[in-house]
Amino acid sequence: MHGLFVNKKKNDTGSTALVLKKIQSGDTKLKEEFIKDNVPYIIRTISNILGIVVDDRNSEEFSIGLAAFNEAIDRYDADKNGNFYTYSFVVIKSRLYDFIRRNRKHNNVLPFSYIEESTRVDERLLMSDASGQFEKIEVRQELVSFEKSLKEFGISLEDLVLSSPKHKDSRLLLIKIARIIADDDNMFRKLVEKKYIPMKEVLSRIKVNHKTIQRNRKFIIAVSLILRSNLYDLKEYVQGFEREGKYHG
């Protein structure tokens, strides 16, 4: 049965839910096969969340991701949790963030991979025992506002985890571009009103290939919004990278 569970389409929630129901009923062999077939998905998810290449199946990161995937299987409820792979992504993300907080090795994980408030909210939503709990979860108003602003640009918090730059120099360059936009009232107004980066104005202020801006549009927009927001924790995180760049520059 190897390969049976690989490359499941997002709309294939029903068949996956049936498999998971059998597993939760005690079919341990099926569970082993399901986990084995999803190892590439687990590795890819860990790599995307941490912004690193995870190819060593004996690594601590992989062990945490594997345990989290197993946890997602055990706790999944098709009636409340929707698509299993979306659910498992959040569980893996939450467990990895717990690891990050304990391990200085990952101090340079990108800021959008470390939105703790969002992680807690996601996990509480997905793991709540009753749908009525959804309405009881309190979310910081500034984060809600930030998420709404991102949605206007077609960007989600998960998009930022996947699209954030992995290298320090790239990150500093993109933050510099975002700072140029945020500090210029005219450019920022165009960004907010027209929902695109004012390319001509940006290129007149900094020497950079326009393709670099296009490829990293989501990150630049998000940082620009943060710099003009009241998101003090995230703003401080961004400003910390700016200070570090100036110190080492």
UniProtKB/Swiss-Prot annotation:
Compartment annotation: Cytoplasm
Keyword Transcription regulation attached: yes
GO-annotated biological processes: DNA-templated transcription initiation
Superkingdom, taxonomy of origin: Bacteria
Motif Polymerase core binding, residue numbers: 60-73
GO molecular-function terms, A-Z: DNA binding; sigma factor activity
Subunit-level organization: Interacts with RsgI3.
Function: Sigma factors are initiation factors that promote the attachment of RNA polymerase to specific initiation sites and are then released. This sigma factor is involved in regulation of cellulosomal genes via an external polysaccharide-sensing mechanism. Recognizes the predicted promoters associated with sigI3 itself, pl11, ce12 and cipA.
HAMAP family assigned: Sigma70_SigI
Full protein name: RNA polymerase sigma factor SigI3
Source organism per UniProt: Acetivibrio thermocellus (strain ATCC 27405 / DSM 1237 / JCM 9322 / NBRC 103400 / NCIMB 10682 / NRRL B-4536 / VPI 7372)
